[in-house]
């Protein structure tokens, strides 16, 4: 239930997020497993998995949904080897080289033959809708994966006017200044990990871990026209994370003090524990994210 990554999007026009209506809409795009000839399937599953029946899970107007993608694993090398063997066999039989059109048709036949026997992998992606804050959070490792899920949500709802929540001031400019002068806004502190890149197209990239970021070595890189593109940060000793230049938030780690607030709920009661953890996550994000964006100089004004 605790997000490991966070791609933050801002709702830039008024949207009525009605949980009951969304429940019905999600059901229309419910996930179904791959059939024998399907390369992939993408749809919605219960937000609490086997511990809940509803597609959505709601806490104080915040809505959690979950998308599932199943993909058949057909390595290109396997297809290529099978195709080469078949082409050699047919060219030997017919005594002539096969045309491109014939090879393409063979390739399609090979894929059709391999699909039913292919292994599949599945991935869950959670989306947290925060109407009061006007934010949507996607627990994904990249904006590309987040956009895929939001495209499905947009198709499901009919409309979803969102944009990545990117501050007006370039994130790398702010991160570089924080490392340079060591003066972070209240509640934020540097950890010991950063990535610095040269402003030159073919310049060097420096990655450091367990490194005192106020050291002369790090400052010399900044003076040599490198900017901080990733930075490990601590927020109020409650959340640790890595912030990147594209404003993606990764490797979220929550303090024991925070997570232990629900220790009175038995682990055996998974549904109750998930619900309580979700409430904690929502409460924390509703304070952390506005604090972070204010520290980064604020977001542009939304469209009228």
Swiss-Prot record:
Keywords: Cytoplasm, DNA recombination. One of its GO terms (molecular function) is double-stranded DNA binding. InterPro entries: RdgC (IPR007476). One of its GO terms (cellular component) is cytoplasm. GO terms for biological process: DNA recombination; regulation of DNA recombination. It is found in: Cytoplasm, Nucleoid. Belongs to the RdgC family. PANTHER family: RECOMBINATION-ASSOCIATED PROTEIN RDGC. May be involved in recombination. This is Recombination-associated protein RdgC.
């Amino acid at each position: 239930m605790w997000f490991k990554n966070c791609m933050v999007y801002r709702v830039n026009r008024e949207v009525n997020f009605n949980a009951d209506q969304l429940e019905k809409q999600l059901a229309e795009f419910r996930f179904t497993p791959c059939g024998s000839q399907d390369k992939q399937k993408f749809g919605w599953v219960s937000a609490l998995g086997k511990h809940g029946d509803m597609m959505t899970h709601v806490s104080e107007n915040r809505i959690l949904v979950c998308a599932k993608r199943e993909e058949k694993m057909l390595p290109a090398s396997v297809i290529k080897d099978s195709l080469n063997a078949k082409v050699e066999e047919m060219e030997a039989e017919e005594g002539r080289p096969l045309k491109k059109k014939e090879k393409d048709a063979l390739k399609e036949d090979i894929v059709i033959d391999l699909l039913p026997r292919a292994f599949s992998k599945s991935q869950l992606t959670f989306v947290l809708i925060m109407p009061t804050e006007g934010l949507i959070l996607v627990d994904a490792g990249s904006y590309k994966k987040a956009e895929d899920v939001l495209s499905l949500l947009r198709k499901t709802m009919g409309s979803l006017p969102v944009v990545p929540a990117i501050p007006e001031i370039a994130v790398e400019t702010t991160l570089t200044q924080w490392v340079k002068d060591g003066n972070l806004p209240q509640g934020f502190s540097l950890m010991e990990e950063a990535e610095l890149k040269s402003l030159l197209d073919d310049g060097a990239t420096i990655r450091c871990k367990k490194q005192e970021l106020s050291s002369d070595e790090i400052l010399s890189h900044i003076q040599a026209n490198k900017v901080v593109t990733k930075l490990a940060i601590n927020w109020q000793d409650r959340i640790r994370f890595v912030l990147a230049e594209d404003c993606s938030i990764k490797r979220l780690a929550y303090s024991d003090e925070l997570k232990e607030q629900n220790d009175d709920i038995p682990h055996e009661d998974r549904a109750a524990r998930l619900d309580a953890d979700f409430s904690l996550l929502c409460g924390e994000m509703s304070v952390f994210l506005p604090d972070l964006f204010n520290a980064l100089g604020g977001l542009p004004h939304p469209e009228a």
